[in-house]
Amino acid sequence: TKEYLVLQPNNRIGLVRGYLAEHGFVIRDEALCFENGRHYAIIRAEAGESPRLSALEQELGPVNLQKRPSLLASYARHRLKVHESILYTMEQGEIRGEAYGFSQGMVRSIQHYLEEAEDEGI
């Protein structure tokens, strides 16, 4: 039997996916669920060589983007709100820098994904 990890990160899921890819793990499966007003992402990973993940793949999940589960649009809108909130907080504190630029880019990427998904009727 093959050994694997099952992970359900509560926050900073993009960093978890990025860490897995950079440290000898490949994401084999993912699941999304929505319960009690919260989104949850579950990752199944195993040892192996992973392709480099784009920022959007890290944020929404490479398997999710490929399989397009029914909750993906809702999850993407949730992640969009998270990054918009981060930007708002940083703007209120007049904070700029790498983290600000990352969240700006993520907002654009998720908005673009949602527009494409809507155009495709997903």
Residue ranges and their predicted role:
Residues 1-122:
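Class I S-adenosyl-L-methionine
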